[in-house]
Amino acid sequence: MAREMTILGSAVLTLLLAGYLAQQYLPLPTPKVIGIDLGTTYCSVGVFFPGTGKVKVIPDENGHISIPSMVSFTDNDVYVGYESVELADSNPQNTIYDAKRFIGKIFTAEELEAEIGRYPFKVLNKNGMVEFSVTSNETITVSPEYVGSRLLLKLKEMAEAYLGMPVANAVISVPAEFDLKQRNSTIEAANLAGLKILRVINEPTAAAMAYGLHKADVFHVLVIDLGGGTLDVSLLNKQGGMFLTRAMSGNNKLGGQDFNQRLLQYLYKQIYQTYGFVPSRKEEIHRLRQAVEMVKLNLTLHQSAQLSVLLTVEEQDRKEPHSSDTELPKDKLSSADDHRVNSGFGRGLSDKKSGESQVLFETEISRKLFDTLNEDLFQKILVPIQQVLKEGHLEKTEIDEVVLVGGSTRIPRIRQVIQEFFGKDPNTSVDPDLAVVTGVAIQAGIDGGSWPLQVSALEIPNKHLQKTNFN
């Protein structure tokens, strides 16, 4: 008997040693489950690699680690992401964006009427649900789920190209405020793209996982997510690996594009006062928007940034420079507000015609000026923060960890406003643009059985949870 036990023990040790050696020296298995962040403005896909425990956010064929959440319909094809951006100026009525705002959501007639005016494409009311009307070879209607499926198909193809194998399973993130219908509609979009969703995870929980908080000894976690067009603030309670969303608040009309818009309006006034005209050509407006976006990005790292844009002057619209009439003409001012979400993308110059001339508009923008133009908007970030603390019955000193998500949280003044409010630095150890997709990829690795084993995030449903919006 003793001999048999010795043999059995030796066999077990041999198997364990073989497993260890296999993990150390055999090729690592390819991830089989992808993690997807289907964002309002940008979306991305990542994988968790067994063995190393590292997350890779997968780039597209041009090296972009996220793609614009934009889909264009033409007579010949459907274009997604950056290809869609290239068509946004010439084909705005058939270029759909912000589909995530509408997916699975039921609107009142008044709510939908307020939304319709914000977009250059046709938004239709189908019994309280949204459909988009687009014209290619014929006029058709497409659902937000279909638009989402085209984005998800692109992300799926990016993952397959990177991994060198078909991908069928995914974990996807959604806003914590999404109800069951919105979550099911997101799953439907994934199914249309050929993906089986193993799990839906809340975006704040995913961000907390990216920061490693599912393994950390913290209880009250505040997630501030400020992207291109929306602000979401979530209060999480974490115990062990379980997360409960205690309170949510936000502003669906506040984000990086609004900060760009303030600088753009300032530049319009400068151009009008200097040259006596306001840019009116779409391609030049978009080039100016592109320059504004680059200035904003540069100002996150530097105290000042240069802006240079070539503009066409139509002499019949020109007034005397430095005239006392410094107010922008209202008909021209509106062009600066059009197609808000398409900011940052431009086209080529038109040829000069008779009665036209070109000027090179150059200026230097300081970080102080940018902050001054947007200070009231920056302060608005604190309103939903105060609201979630109120709903959570907490003092700001009771928050264990403040984590930042979304590209707009890179702005130094925004970080300073948050730091001054809480009296401590927010956690900035993770790239805010990639926090959600990183967390989703970790959860995808867990659901795919990858090793080294991670602590899974268990979300406790909160049926009484409602988001307070300050729009």
Curated annotation (Swiss-Prot):
Binds UBQLN2. It holds the Pfam family HSP70. Transmembrane segments: none annotated. Belongs to the heat shock protein 70 family. This is Heat shock 70 kDa protein 13. Its main location: other. Residues 1-22 form the signal peptide. Constitutively expressed in all tissues.
